[in-house]
Swiss-Prot record:
The keyword Protein biosynthesis is annotated on this UniProt entry: no
Source species taxonomy: Eukaryota, Metazoa, Chordata, Craniata, Vertebrata
Source organism (scientific name): Mus musculus (Mouse)
Chain spans, region Disordered: 287-338, 1099-1122
Function field: Metallocarboxypeptidase that mediates deglutamylation of tubulin and non-tubulin target proteins. Catalyzes the removal of polyglutamate side chains present on the gamma-carboxyl group of glutamate residues within the C-terminal tail of tubulin protein. Specifically cleaves tubulin long-side-chains, while it is not able to remove the branching point glutamate. Also catalyzes the removal of polyglutamate residues from the carboxy-terminus of non-tubulin proteins such as MYLK.
Subunit architecture: Interacts with MYLK. Interacts with TCF4.
GO biological process, one term: proteolysis
Gene for this chain: Agbl1
Substitution effect: E806Q: Abolishes deglutamylase activity
Tissue and organ expression note: Widely expressed at low level. Expressed in eye, muscle, pituitary, testis and to a lower extent in brain.
Protein name (record): Cytosolic carboxypeptidase 4
Active site residues per record: E985
Disulfide-bonded cysteines: none
Amino acid sequence: MAEQEGSGLQMLLHTLQNSSDKASTLSILQVLGDLLSVGTDRRIYYMISKGGSEALLQTLVDTARSSSPDWDILLPLFRLLAKVGLRDKKFGQKALELEALDVTLILARKNLSHSQNLLHCLWVLRVFASSVTTGAMLGINGAMELLFKVLSPYTRKHTRTIRAATEVLAALLKSSKHLRRAVNRGYVNSLLRLHQDWHSRDVTNTYVTIRHGLLLCLRHIVALRSGREAFLAAQGMETLFSSAQTCLENKNMELVISAVIQILRQCYPASRLPLVTASSAYTFPAPGSTSSELPLNLTEEDFDDDGDEEMDKDSDVEAVKEDDDLETDLSKLSSKPGLDLPEEELAQYDAMCPELSCSFEELEPKCGDDLNNKDTLHANHHHIPSVASLRQHCFNREHSSWRQEREDTVHSSILHMVKTGKSGVPSSSKQRSATNVNQSLQQNGLEIDSSGHDTSDIQAPLEQAAWDMEAISCPRITASFPNSTKPEESIGAAEKLLHTHAKHIPFHDPHLYIANAMRTRSAVGFKTMAFPDLWGHCPPPAAQPMLDRKLGVQRIKILEDIRRLLHPSDVINKVVFSLDEPRPLQGSISNCLMFHSKFESGNLRKAIQVREFEYDLLVNADVNSSQHQQWFYFKVSGMRAAVPYHFNIINCEKPNSQFNYGMQPTLYSVKEALLGRPAWIRTGSDICYYKNHYRQNAATMDGALGKRYYTLTFAVTFPHNEDACYLAYHYPYTYSTLMTHLEILERSIDHREIYFRHDVLCQTLGGNPCPLVTITAFPESNSTEHLEQFRCRPYQVITARVHPGESNASWVMKGTLEFLVSSDPVAKLLRENFVFKIIPMLNPDGVINGNHRCSLRGEDLNRQWLSPQAHLQPTIYHAKGLLHYLSSTGRGPVVFCDFHGHSQKKNVFLYGCSMKETLWQAGCTVGESALLEDVSYRTLPKILDKLAPAFTMNSCSFLVEKSRASTARVVVWREMGVSRSYTMESSYCGCNQGPYQGLQFGTGELEEMGAMYCLGLLILELKSVNCSHKLLARASSLLNADVLEHYLQRCSSSSSNSSNRTSEVDDEPYCMEEIDYSADSSSDAEQNFTELDRQIQECALNKDEEEEEKEEGTGWRRRSVT
């Protein structure tokens, strides 16, 4: 049947080429037109495969070269040619070979006064122009001159023809040769005048497509330097800026506004950042480097988070690059367990693992070790709280005992917190779903006293004490809160304030924090503490939804940037804060906000007031680096209440951000904390993230083209006058906070049951101890059997915070630590059957000094795992050494997991390692024997997908990339043979699936994920074939047997959203407004031929209609365009 259809079509085409009878030719064209006007494009592609393009082109040439071309034939023929040519990739080459290009141009020139004939010629020229080869020939043969004759002078007659001419011209101007020709011939002025004619006279916005077509021509022209110069000389910036103001609020003008904005962005002169140098304001004389040395040979991978595919994936080219990065060398993919350290060096790790060799007496806590005093007793808890209960406790004005509250729920295990399904909500989380939160709370999360009680009793002593707000909000590390009116009382001010406004926060003690902060060493010697870190944080009473982005917010910000260029006198441009200035600037500056960032984890380098309530901010690069500007954390004070302040962070590096997809920065108000609501909350409106006009100095990049920067802009309305507020990229978690947390944990546990050991893995380059925590259960007795079971427990290794800016990893780790020492039956089982070795912060120096990614040497420590050196990367060297030591004793970890944060995707997910999946993805064909591997690496992610509300299997990946060869995940997998070696990524933003869909992550959700990870480890063990009957029996006795069986079966069922290979899905749709402004953007309307198809179809249905349109109004002078 198919052969008959093919032969029938070929017969039609053959007859068409050889027929000299007009009626027969018209009949065949009618049949072909009817065939191609219905159904799918498959019919057109089938016709192309049977020589349809050649037949139509040959018919065109034969008809056009006759003494009197018959337009009754040419019109339907042109329509068919345009329709077929859009789908034929070789259409241009075929047209050149058959000389159809020349005859089409000749016909167009002869029909300038016949709009219907000319319109059809232009449609086919539009198809020719989309081909590089035929487009070049059109330019050589004078097509642009022909088009300008059609476009000028301005007229409202034949508007469909004018529209078609603009589209052909826009397609031609994608060629650099045509661009230069257009600039040299003065067409820039002509196009500007034409656009202004249409803009000023099209008052009803009837001809938006023509105006858009002219703007596309200009957009291509300004992509060329000479084109931009001509455009600027013709006052193009001022002209288009003025025209944009008149139509911003008109939704029907979206095409025009978007094109204008892109042209203005393209023409904004590139400039250097307002910094003395791109290098960090902080330096450190690290071994092997000098303070002025910058990292060389930077690659795109240096800007990626571990496992992050941070770059946009909008094209097939990016996909090809990703596939090229896949490791295909079997020798590098194969696991090769072995030691790269001498055995004598491994002996140093004996002291870090006393549980393997010490006697029972040596392990027992000494009499003085029981530190459960009245200050920390209530910090002990019996199981990790759900997000809702944690919030409820933190904002409970009755200050009920934490211990008592936990005792009330001791019989309720973490199992009650797991998600009930992809669309379900955990029972403990129902109350915290996005409820009807007060509008002001949604915006700032601050104005409402969550307890519902009157706050006057707290506010009164605050006012009576008349504290110096600046001193309170950023106290000196000496624990002094100076009071300007009563200096003699300054020494006891801190104690007095803490006593007056005491509010218990679980696992936090300001007194201990001060002590730890005094011991912390920074590169520049910080002398102040951030108030939120001292005072503490409680999750807000309700989950905060993602911010709905308003359409047009980005273009408004960009137009404000353009306004600065065009009207510089309107800009204040006053530096109000700078780390580069030898003396503080703000003492003599008034009528502006005051900024501060010289505290632990703080990052703000410079603040410039540009308008009364608007500031440009620049964040500091990592120490000894000129890169990695993302993390920010600073104090701002001196504000007015109920006034929107706009902040523009102008030196961001990432090409996209979750700030474009609902994420908000975090804010902590000192006054709110003193009023009993100490919380980091998501805040900000009018948020967007886009490429700006700043460029890094090429000299900084070793002569390479200077890197472009991005702007994060947001508005904050502060709740109180003269408050002091802290703003941060994400919820901060400092090194001193960690050390305080570990100390409180150690004090709060029952040392008769829980073996908790806090060691020092090593000293960092900055002189700070890197903590190593061991958690397990004490042996039941000192009998040989119990001691043997104790020493034979398998190990679980968890690390975090190798990248300082990923503070969410620390909050997940906090949840893990608190759960493991809790009285939850699951935690008890885990302690009895595993030894947990935890390094909660692999990069203390980076965290302390406000880095985003690097160590004090300016290098990414997660790219140093292949061959770390003790004097250069001590924490990585000893972490790897400890892992090698465990492997050498036959105690390699069951699971290794490195906690990270992810800035481009939502949810929580794992990256693992699979040789088979990597080779499959890369398209490599190898023998079956080479593909044999342990597939258990998929089990834990599948379990977490069933249990953890924030986790999704869909985003997990198990590919091994060349660029990740030196990361912890890959090195532990390859060198130590740990098949379950993972990176766990937590979004900075929130969830787009499951119970938390549409909500931003708070610290409660992150801590909950840390606890859920532990539950996943237990389920993994219970499901394993080697699970002992004793453990199963113990689990049944501690947990509800029916409930346990339910979850074991549930985690054994196949995941509905996973298969043999889980494909990674795009996390976000295209942004509503273009982040970039490249001239060849795929969103250009001329790239989409659907509209041209529609025009052709419409013309075919109304071919008897006259297209002539009368000019509206009289007396308009037609302006000639030259």
